[in-house]
Structure formats: C-alpha cells, structure tokens
C-alpha cells in the first residue's frame, strides 16, 4: 500500500453515506406503507425464480449504554419487557405468514441488536423456534449468525445457539485498551473475550468475526496496534474494523463522550494506515472498505472473483437474497424496494395490535435507482467495476449513461487512487479507503444534504 500523504488525503474527509443501501435510509418515506410492502412481497413471490430469503431479527434490548453505539437500542433490565417483546414478534410472524410465501428457501438468518444474548437461552430458543415454524425451509448450507456481547454470553447461550444450527458468531470487541473501554462505558477484559471465543470454538463454530472500531476516545496508533496483537492471539476468521462515526446530534448517548479525547483526523488516518499494514502482514486481506478476512476465507475468495455483495449486515458471498426484517426498527430489502419497521416500540406494538404489519417507511426503487444501486454496491464490495456486466444486465452503454460521473472520477485517477482499464476501473489499495467518496459520484440523491452522514475518513 502506498504511503499516505496526510495533507492531501485529508481533503477527502467529508460527510457521506456508508452505502449499506441505495437509496440510503434518509430517502425512506412514509408513503411506502403496509400495502406497498404486501405488493412487493407478491411481486417477489411470483418471480420466475424467487430469490432465497435472508431473515434479520432485531433484538433491541441492552442493560446499559455503550457511548459509541449508533444502533437502535432500548435500555432496560426488566424481564417483562423481553417477554412482551417475544409475544409481539410472534404477532408479526403470523402477519408475515399471511402476507408472503414463507415456504421459500432461507439462505441466511441473523440476530442483531441491541444485545441478542441479553435474552435468556430459553427465550432465544423460543424466538428461534417461532421463526422456524413460520419459515421452515432452511437451506442445507444456511448461514446462521448472531451478534455476541461477551459480557452477556454463557455456556447455556452457546448450547442453545448450537442446538438451533448457528454456525457464525460476531463478537463486539471494539478495543482491548482499558482507558478506551472506560471512555466508551464498556468494560470487557481480554480474558472475558478469550473465554467466549474458546467456548464458541469448542462447539465447532466455523466462522468467528470481531467488530473493532478506530477513532474512539483515548485511542492511539500504538494502543490500537496492541489491541490487534491481542486479537491475533484469538485468531478470528474475519474482522470488521469500523471508523467511529461521532454523530451526537443523531445519538444522544454519544454526547457523553469527551470530544477532547477523540483522535484528530490525522491521528485516525495514521491508525487506519497502520492497522491495514499490520493485518495484511498477519495474512488478513482487506475486504471492501472496512472488513478483513484470512486469505483462505470465503469472503476473500469471493473478492478475487468479484462476487462479493453488500447489505445491511455487511459483506456476503450470497449473490441475491430478499431480506425480511423482523422486529422493531428492522430493515427489509428486495430487488426494488427497502422497508423499515417502526423505530418506536410503542408504535410497533400498536400496529401489530391493530393487525397491521409494522411498516413505518420505505422506498420503491425506480429502474434508474436499481441501476445505480448495482453500480454502487459493486464498487463498495469489490473496489472495481466491470462495465460489461452492468451493460449486459441493464441494456445500457455505460460510458454514455454515466459520462458525467466518470468525469468526476478523473481527479482520483490523477491522484493515483484509481485506474481505468479496458473493462472499467479499479481502485488502488489506498484508493479503496476512499470508496465511499467515489461511490458518492454515482449517487443521484446527494444534493447538499450530506449533514446526515458521518465523515468518510
């Protein structure tokens, strides 16, 4: 990787989407309602070759706040809230069964949060069974994954997940430095994480991911490299290394972070450059803009074939799935729509009590949206673009259709961050760090409203 010129590189740091969707969530509107979703379900059920399903269930509860967290979370220690939530999940599942063909193949299954393991093992088992009763056709090679908070993870949890077929776990690690953990209100010693990982390995979990974050308060380059040394001792299969997005105007808990302790933009770039170098020397290859995988991992092998896909859960080797969002605030996705459930638990419950799917908002994609989504997701996933694949799928002349956008990429070429070739273009190793910036050139919705987003660097 070329050495970063920090003065020149800093010019690229500006607010921009992470492109877990296109159009992005700020474009979701309330005129996409329950009837819109039912129509989308009908259309997808009646495709000549219906896509496999990906089930995402949001389990929103946490006992206490982690100050860095941007997830949709409800803080509670009340058992009755969890019991009540399970009853409403069952109501939603019953409505989904009537609204779509739930006998279609399920290729992916994911629990996110919140803290999924804040639910007791019997409760997790009850939730999983309820979902499997409605969506019974699990594929033989299904990916079943769960987010794990090591502070709330027991052998009984692991046994339940194992019995239900879970084969992937993602551990929230963030940073092993105690001073960083204190500043973000999340204390979890290395030994605690080590014990949780050993438990997962003992049960034969085939894929273990760690979530790490750089840009947190009290972080330094030296300190984060020490965290990475500890990470290597635990030998995860994959790493997601996120750039901390400090958006206190969006997430109130972030206001508890002392901003004077946050690394400067230059310091963050130094951390990023050093972590990429460190991990690549340790045989972890960079995937997209924020993931790493061992060179024999399926993610890296898919990247080599330009077959990676990106969705709200991150990067995947599954080519095309229809995501069904279950639970408060969860997001669903089809080939030409996005939908989101109510973010407020009260309104989520009220809709279900009235017998309605709890749709708060969404967006139906135009043909141009679908085209641009494909371009942006290819860029975000594979850090390159083959024009012919887009031309064949959408019957367009790529260079003519995106003449203005390609002109906007030329400064990146001149800076040595991107190269054009006979097939299309490809980002350099350093240019891949700016994939969000380059993808923004193809975003038809950006019109000075970038204040909604975190900075790209």
Swiss-Prot record:
[4Fe-4S] cluster binds at residues 62, 66, 69. It is an enzyme of class 1 (oxidoreductase). Residues 47-279 form the Radical SAM core domain. Pfam families: HemN_C (PF06969), Radical_SAM (PF04055). Its main location: cytoplasm. It is found in: Cytoplasm. One of its GO terms (molecular function) is metal ion binding. Its cofactor is [4Fe-4S] cluster. GO terms for biological process: porphyrin-containing compound biosynthetic process; protoporphyrinogen IX biosynthetic process. S-adenosyl-L-methionine 2 binds at residues 68, 114-115, 174, 186, 211, 245. Pathway: Porphyrin-containing compound metabolism; protoporphyrin-IX biosynthesis; protoporphyrinogen-IX from coproporphyrinogen-III (AdoMet route): step 1/1. Its EC number is 1.3.98.3. SUPFAM superfamilies: Radical SAM enzymes. S-adenosyl-L-methionine 1 binds at residues 56, 113, 147, 331. Keywords: 4Fe-4S, Cytoplasm, Iron, Iron-sulfur, Metal-binding, Oxidoreductase, Porphyrin biosynthesis, S-adenosyl-L-methionine. Disulfide bonds: none annotated. The keyword tRNA processing does not apply. GO terms for cellular component: cytoplasm. Binds 1 [4Fe-4S] cluster. The cluster is coordinated with 3 cysteines and an exchangeable S-adenosyl-L-methionine. Monomer. Involved in the heme biosynthesis. Catalyzes the anaerobic oxidative decarboxylation of propionate groups of rings A and B of coproporphyrinogen III to yield the vinyl groups in protoporphyrinogen IX. This is Oxygen-independent coproporphyrinogen III oxidase.
């Amino acid at each position: 990787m070329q050495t970063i010129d920090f003065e020149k590189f800093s010019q690229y740091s500006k607010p921009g989407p992470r492109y877990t969707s296109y159009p992005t969530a700020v474009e979701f509107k309330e005129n996409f309602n329950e009837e819109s979703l039912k129509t989308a379900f009908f259309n997808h059920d009646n495709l000549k070759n219906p896509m496999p399903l990906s089930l995402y269930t949001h389990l929103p509860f946490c006992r206490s706040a982690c100050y860095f967290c941007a997830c949709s979370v409800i803080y509670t220690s009340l058992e009755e809230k969890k019991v009540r939530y399970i009853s409403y999940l069952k109501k939603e599942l019953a409505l989904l069964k009537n609204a779509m063909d739930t006998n279609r193949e399920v290729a992916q299954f994911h629990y996110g949060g919140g803290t999924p393991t804040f639910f007791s093992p019997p409760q997790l088992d009850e939730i999983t069974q309820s979902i499997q009763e409605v969506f019974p056709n699990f594929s033989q090679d299904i990916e079943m994954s769960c987010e794990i908070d090591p502070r709330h993870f027991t052998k009984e949890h692991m046994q339940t997940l194992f019995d239900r077929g879970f084969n992937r776990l993602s551990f929230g690690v963030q940073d092993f430095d105690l001073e960083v953990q204190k500043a973000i209100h999340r204390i979890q010693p290395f030994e605690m994480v080590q014990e949780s990982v050993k438990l997962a390995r003992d049960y034969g979990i085939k894929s273990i991911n760690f979530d790490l974050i750089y840009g947190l308060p009290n972080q330094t380059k030296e300190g984060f490299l020490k965290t990475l040394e500890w990470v290597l001792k635990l030998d995860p299969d994959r790493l997601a290394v996120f750039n901390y997005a400090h958006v206190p105007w969006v997430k109130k808990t972030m206001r508890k972070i002392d901003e004077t302790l946050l690394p400067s933009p230059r310091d963050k770039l130094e951390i990023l450059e050093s972590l990429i170098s460190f991990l690549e020397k340790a045989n972890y290859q960079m995937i997209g803009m924020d993931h790493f995988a061992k060179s024999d991992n399926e993610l890296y092998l898919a990247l080599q074939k330009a077959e990676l896909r990106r969705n709200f859960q991150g990067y995947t080797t599954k080519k095309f799935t229809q995501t069904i969002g279950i639970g408060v605030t969860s997001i669903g996705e089809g080939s030409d729509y996005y939908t989101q459930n109510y973010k407020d638990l009260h309104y989520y419950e009220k809709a279900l009590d009235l017998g309605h799917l709890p749709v708060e908002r969404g967006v139906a994609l135009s043909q141009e949206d679908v085209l641009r989504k494909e371009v942006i997701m290819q860029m975000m996933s594979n850090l390159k673009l083959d024009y012919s694949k887009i031309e064949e799928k959408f019957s367009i002349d790529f260079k003519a259709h995106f003449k203005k956008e390609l002109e906007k990429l030329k400064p990146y070429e001149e800076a040595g961050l991107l190269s054009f070739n006979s097939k299309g273009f490809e980002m350099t190793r350093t240019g891949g760090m700016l994939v969000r910036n380059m993808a923004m050139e193809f975003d038809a919705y950006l019109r000075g409203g970038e204040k909604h987003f975190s900075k790209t660097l």
